[in-house]
Amino acid sequence: MAKKSMVERWKKPKKFKVREYTRCSICGRVHSVYREFGICRVCFRKMANEGKLPGVRKASW
């Protein structure tokens, strides 16, 4: 989990639009963030397994 001061820092608008980047809304992770859900792959997997993401199911073929 990210420090509270860092979370507040990320929320502030950037001086230049180019400097903005996606972060996980739950843990603050920078890499592998799904834009559609706004969360990282780690949080996505955890929430999907708990059934907290509607319409998401485990693939089986």
UniProtKB/Swiss-Prot annotation:
Keywords: Metal-binding, Ribonucleoprotein, Ribosomal protein, RNA-binding, rRNA-binding, Zinc. PROSITE patterns: RIBOSOMAL_S14. One of its GO terms (biological process) is translation. Zn(2+) binds at residues 24, 27, 40, 43. SUPFAM superfamilies: Glucocorticoid receptor-like (DNA-binding domain). Its cofactor is Zn(2+). It comes from the Bacteria. Gene3D superfamilies: 30s Ribosomal Protein S14, Chain N. Pfam families: Ribosomal_S14 (PF00253). Part of the 30S ribosomal subunit. Contacts proteins S3 and S10. Binds 16S rRNA, required for the assembly of 30S particles and may also be responsible for determining the conformation of the 16S rRNA at the A site. This is Small ribosomal subunit protein uS14. It comes from Fervidobacterium nodosum (strain ATCC 35602 / DSM 5306 / Rt17-B1).
